[in-house]
């Protein structure tokens, strides 16, 4: 990684504006999963231990530039304080006189959490005035919010124009793991691409076909490829306007010598419900009024064998409608295969894949779970992430 990190700068006595990703799931004002808060702890602890005055900023949800009471960060400040075992002060604004006064009161090793930065319309517009106001609070900017690195917002990109800007440890790990996967992978290198829509994964499939040895396709997007092979897909998800593209991807795989794996059998249902009637059918025998909602047992075995023989696997997107237990077997089989394959380095690309390994209790068996769904997707598309570009080079 060629970006400076907090190790490369002296933080003692400095006011450090640290952008974190505390966008945690909430229900009735309570945090239901604190993974993202825990993920930022190494950076926050390092700053505390090295005598920084720590100013934390994050978004929560999508308030669209207005104050939304249930999206305030009070519950986050409380949970962070419990995890750090020290008080975390919190302001009701993210800029302004109240915030300046709170920053002035900070001693070395103190932690202050600003209010939800997306309460300000200027945040998502990357308004230079808001970015300047953030910058005026601090001497140094640290970005540890990989999950928001694909956004050019005031607190992720704009602020870096006005302060020295470096990466935190979480950002560093994400860039190192994903960067190595794309630039210098251990082989055989396998990508597993699932999820509902081809259109969301076009860039990823296109970029990965240049790099992988094996490409495994699953989830709703697989049926556009199945249709491209000339098979009927019944009422399964289908993007008619992407059939030609699917054909071209299969052609490209052949040209590049990439082994392209698709489902050989599927679990079909007569309606979209957990208690629907289901059966397993070969891929070329999906009944007209049924939908394929998961990969079948033969496909699970096939994919498991490919995983077992891989040195590196990047997984982005589930194999079926894993939220319904009846159609979770395919996704679970992938997670289990990765957990069991000890010689295989597993990178889970955030979003639904991360939620799936959590659901099956296998998160601790994965080598790297990305904290950014959209960010890891754009990184794997080969795009430059604005929040990363803005950081200082070593």
UniProtKB/Swiss-Prot annotation:
Ligand binding (substrate): 21-23, 36, 59-62, 118, 151
CDD domains for the chain: Phosphoglycerate_kinase (cd00318)
Pfam families in the record: PGK (PF00162)
Residue list for modification Phosphothreonine: 299
Residue numbers carrying Phosphoserine: 183
Catalytic activity: (2R)-3-phosphoglycerate + ATP = (2R)-3-phospho-glyceroyl phosphate + ADP
Biological-process GO terms, alphabetical: gluconeogenesis; glycolytic process
GO cellular component: cytosol
Top EC class for this record: transferase
Domain of life: Bacteria
UniProt binding sites for ATP: 201, 316, 323, 350-353
Pathway: Carbohydrate degradation; glycolysis; pyruvate from D-glyceraldehyde 3-phosphate: step 2/5
UniProt cross-references to InterPro entries, sorted A to Z: Phosphoglycerate_kinase, Phosphoglycerate_kinase_CS, Phosphoglycerate_kinase_N, Phosphoglycerate_kinase_sf
This enzyme's EC code(s): 2.7.2.3
Assigned protein family: Belongs to the phosphoglycerate kinase family.
Subunit note: Monomer.
Protein's recorded name: Phosphoglycerate kinase
């Amino acid at each position: 990684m060629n970006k400076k990190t907090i190790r490369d700068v002296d933080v003692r006595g400095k006011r450090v504006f640290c952008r974190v990703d505390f966008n945690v799931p909430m229900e009735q004002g309570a945090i239901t999963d604190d993974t993202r808060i825990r993920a930022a702890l190494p950076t926050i602890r390092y700053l505390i231990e090295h005598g920084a005055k720590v100013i934390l900023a994050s978004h929560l949800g999508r308030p669209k530039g207005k104050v939304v009471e249930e999206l305030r960060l009070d519950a986050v400040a409380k949970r962070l304080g419990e995890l750090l075992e020290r008080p975390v002060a919190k302001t009701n604004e993210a800029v302004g006189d109240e915030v300046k006064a709170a920053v002035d009161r900070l001693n070395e090793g103190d932690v202050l959490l600003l209010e939800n930065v997306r309460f300000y319309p200027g945040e998502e517009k990357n308004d230079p005035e808001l970015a300047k106001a953030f910058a005026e609070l601090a001497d140094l900017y640290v970005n540890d919010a990989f999950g928001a690195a694909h956004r050019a917002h005031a607190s992720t990109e704009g602020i870096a124009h006005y302060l020295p800007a470096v990466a935190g440890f979480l950002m560093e790990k994400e860039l190192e793991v994903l960067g190595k996967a794309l630039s210098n992978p251990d082989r055989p290198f396998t990508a597993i691409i699932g999820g509902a829509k081809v259109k969301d994964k076009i860039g990823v499939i296109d970029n990965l076909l240049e790099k992988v040895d094996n490409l495994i396709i699953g989830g709703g997007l697989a049926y556009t490829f199945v249709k491209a092979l000339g098979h009927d897909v019944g009422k399964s998800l289908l993007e008619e306007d992407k059939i030609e593209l699917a054909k071209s991807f299969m052609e490209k795989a052949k040209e590049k010598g990439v082994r392209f794996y698709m489902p050989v059998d599927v679990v079909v249902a007569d309606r979209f419900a957990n208690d629907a009637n289901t059966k397993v059918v070969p891929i070329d025998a999906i009944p007209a009024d049924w939908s394929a909602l998961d990969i079948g047992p033969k496909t699970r075995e096939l994919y498991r064998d490919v995983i077992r023989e891989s040195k590196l696997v990047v997984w982005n997107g589930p194999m079926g409608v894993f939220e319904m237990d009846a159609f979770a077997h395919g996704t679970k089989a992938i997670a289990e295969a990765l957990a069991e394959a000890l010689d295989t380095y597993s990178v889970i690309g955030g979003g639904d894949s991360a939620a799936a390994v959590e659901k099956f209790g296998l998160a601790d068996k994965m080598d790297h779970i990305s904290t950014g769904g959209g960010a890891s997707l754009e990184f794997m598309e080969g795009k430059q992430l604005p929040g990363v570009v803005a950081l200082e080079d070593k």
